[in-house]
């Protein structure tokens, strides 16, 4: 993982960081499940103020998908999109094609995601009865 400037450790290259993070998390579960990832990510650096909560959010979501959503055989797909929408507003979208378990929406994982979203000064939303979650935040 490379800092944008060797003298400036406050920013990391987003693409490299997310790719390494996702590969590390999924490789821990490689014997249990095969996960295909589609990463639509922007090509830029990101301040550590944002990258740390985003990394924790993705760790929680990916681990949750692997542990709970992918119970059946077949293609397991996780989609992560990170894009600037407008005027500094950024959207992080996460979804998987696994099974949604309704009873777990108020658990510790959900609370953690809400706290991390607050750290981003952002907003978390989830589409009903699906594992599709969005985080919107401003990088300013």
Question: Where does each model-flagged region fall?
Answer:
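Short beta-to-alpha transition helix within the HATPase_c
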Residues: 8-28, 83
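Short beta-strand/loop element within the Bergerat-fold HATPase_c
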Residues: 75-88
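Glycine-rich nucleotide-binding loop
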Residues: 77, 100, 128-135
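ATP phosphate-binding glycine-rich loop and adjacent ATP-lid/helix-beta elements
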Residues: 100-127
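Conserved DxG motif in ATP/Mg2+-binding regions
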Residues: 91-98
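Flexible helix-coil linker/loop segments in the cytosolic histidine kinase module
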Residues: 1-13, 68-70
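Conserved short alpha-helical segment within the C-terminal cytosolic histidine kinase catalytic core
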Residues: 4, 20-32, 53, 57-60, ...
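Conserved short strand/loop->alpha-helix "switch" segment adjacent to the catalytic nucleotide/phosphoryl-transfer site
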Residues: 30-62, 66-74
